[in-house]
Amino acid sequence: KFCEKPSGTWSGVCGNSGACKDQCIRLEGAKHGSCNYKPPAHRCICYYEC
């Protein structure tokens, strides 16, 4: 099971899930990452093991 947390290093709207994933894994130690719609915009969300 994964817990999601907004990226602490991504700024602005997320338009590239691949780049978001790479940044979550490389810079934040996450297992995965993707762009998710969190009103009011798409954000880079990192996923960690709970």
Curated annotation (Swiss-Prot):
Q: Which GO terms describe its biological process?
A: defense response to fungus; defense response to Gram-negative bacterium; defense response to Gram-positive bacterium; killing of cells of another organism
Please name the Gene3D superfamilies in this protein's record.
Knottin, scorpion toxin-like
Modification after translation? Contains 4 disulfide bonds.
| Alphabetically ordered keywords of this record | Antibiotic, Antimicrobial, Disulfide bond, Fungicide, Plant defense, Secreted
Give each disulfide bond as a residue pair: C3-C50, C14-C35, C20-C44, C24-C46
- Chief location bin: secreted
Protease: present as a keyword of the record?
A: no
Q: Where in the cell is it found?
A: Secreted
* Pfam families per UniProt: Gamma-thionin
What's in the GO CC field?
Answer: extracellular region
> So what does this one do?
Antimicrobial peptide active against fungi, Gram-positive and Gram-negative bacteria. Inhibits growth of hyphae in the fungi A.niger (IC(50)=3.5 ug/ml), B.sorokiniana (IC(50)=3.0 ug/ml), F.oxysporum (IC(50)=9.5 ug/ml), F.graminearum (IC(50)=6.9 ug/ml), F.culmorum (IC(50)=6.9 ug/ml) and B.cinerea (IC(50)=27.4 ug/ml). Has no effect on spore germination. Destroys spores in germinated conidia by disruption of cell walls and membranes in A.niger and B.sorokiniana. Causes vacuolization of germinated macro- and microconidia in F.oxysporum, F.graminearum and F.culmorum.
Query: Family assignment?
Result: Belongs to the DEFL family.
What is the designated name of this protein?
Answer: Defensin D1
